[in-house]
Amino acid sequence: MMKGISSVSQSINYNPYIEFNRPQLQISTVNPNPAQSRFSRPRSLRVLSLSADPSANRNPKSAVDAHAPPLVVVGSANADIYVEIERLPKEGETISAKTGQTLAGGKGANQAACGAKLMYPTYFVGRLGEDAHGKLIAEALGDDGCGVHLDYVRSVNNEPTGHAVVMLQSDGQNSIIIVGGANMKAWPEIMSDDDLEIVRNAGIVLLQREIPDSINIQVAKAVKKAGVPVILDVGGMDTPIPNELLDSIDILSPNETELSRLTGMPTETFEQISQAVAKCHKLGVKQVLVKLGSKGSALFIQGEKPIQQSIIPAAQVVDTTGAGDTFTAAFAVAMVEGKSHEECLRFAAAAASLCVQVKGAIPSMPDRKSVLKLLKFSI
């Protein structure tokens, strides 16, 4: 069994109240006032000066007061099996890859890794298999890796860790095939109070669509009731998003392809993107954060003028895997730190620019010092 991660055998019915090991921070670190109810949220977010020099902070893992409500990511964790190829194979064709390796990834794990590497207190709620891929992910995310708190990650012995085949082409673009594994099949029907407690006490929550919609709905409803902002990254399943989920989120974050799929509308021009976003507004989503790849990003707030952000050019594009996750997580970190919308977009753009310059998803996530340095020299 992996260190710091509880094991759940599913040869019998899953018990959502099963005890699990918590060797690290307890939930009390989320609530700076022990006199408050375990489910009450701090009324204010205490953020320290965000020094570009991590050594200037009391906690080398965090640039923010440890009592600040954390970023909580509920989602997927995958082992990304990379194969570098010159081009995609044609139907019936077999081609040779230049190289191959396995790295930790998955949209949820990527976003959690990014939050922690940006030195904001970050918790990950997810499911792994008891296998080599699960161990790889736990080591990449945990104290010896990115510094993500894994108190709410559970492992199961009858489902494999989720994995993905990433076909990386010579121009840095990629195509991905995902096997859900534990991400899709190891969750309980009803989320435990323990798992919901951490999201109720969060400063902000990130969701994606690589885990069951039923889990996202339970989390989003609990978060909405607690008054915690939640961002839903559209990446993952290509099925329609349930209205129950849309009704409980604050920000919907698709890329332009996902926006087109979601609305059934073209998204080739900014005008078309704006029209597609208007359809999302009619579905009840007031804020839509659209990732536009090489064209940058845009935040659409219902009733307001869109806020556009150009890309911050990368010295070289090595691998775009994880760039969208980096952008979303960096935006969330800036948002929970109280930055303006414009500052959030720029901070996220800088993080994404650094991400695409390194191969792999989690290995490419930038640290705060690098992001601040890029922002300083790209004004």
UniProtKB/Swiss-Prot annotation:
Family per similarity comment: Belongs to the carbohydrate kinase PfkB family. Ribokinase subfamily.
Entry keyword annotation includes Repeat: no
Enzyme class: transferase
Active-site residues from the entry: 325 (proton acceptor)
Binding-site residues, K(+): 319, 321, 355, 358, 360, 364
PANTHER family for this protein: RIBOKINASE, SUGAR KINASE
Binding site for ATP: 255, 291-296, 324-325
UniProt-listed Pfam families: PfkB (PF00294)
Record GO biological process: D-ribose catabolic process; nucleoside metabolic process
Cofactor: how and how many bound: Requires a divalent cation, most likely magnesium in vivo, as an electrophilic catalyst to aid phosphoryl group transfer. It is the chelate of the metal and the nucleotide that is the actual substrate.
Pathway info: Carbohydrate metabolism; D-ribose degradation; D-ribose 5-phosphate from beta-D-ribopyranose: step 2/2
Gene that encodes it: RBSK
Primary role: Catalyzes the phosphorylation of ribose at O-5 in a reaction requiring ATP and magnesium. The resulting D-ribose-5-phosphate can then be used either for sythesis of nucleotides, histidine, and tryptophan, or as a component of the pentose phosphate pathway. Can also use xylose and fructose as carbohydrate substrates with a low efficiency. Can use GTP, and, to a lower extent, CTP and UTP as alternative phosphoryl donors.
Locations listed in the record: Plastid, Chloroplast stroma, Chloroplast nucleoid
This protein's UniProt keywords: ATP-binding, Carbohydrate metabolism, Chloroplast, Kinase, Magnesium, Metal-binding, Nucleotide-binding, Plastid, Potassium, Transferase, Transit peptide
Lineage of producing organism: Eukaryota, Viridiplantae, Streptophyta, Embryophyta, Tracheophyta
Recorded catalytic activity of this chain's protein: D-ribose + ATP = D-ribose 5-phosphate + ADP + H(+)
Summary of the knockout phenotype: Abnormal accumulation of D-ribose. D-ribose hypersensitivity; normal growth except in the presence of D-ribose, which leads to chlorosis and growth inhibition.
An MF annotation (GO) of this entry: metal ion binding
Subunit relationships: Homodimer.
GO CC, alphabetical: chloroplast; chloroplast nucleoid; chloroplast stroma; nucleus; plastid nucleoid
Protein name: Ribokinase
Names of the cofactor(s): Mg(2+)
Superkingdom of the source species: Eukaryota
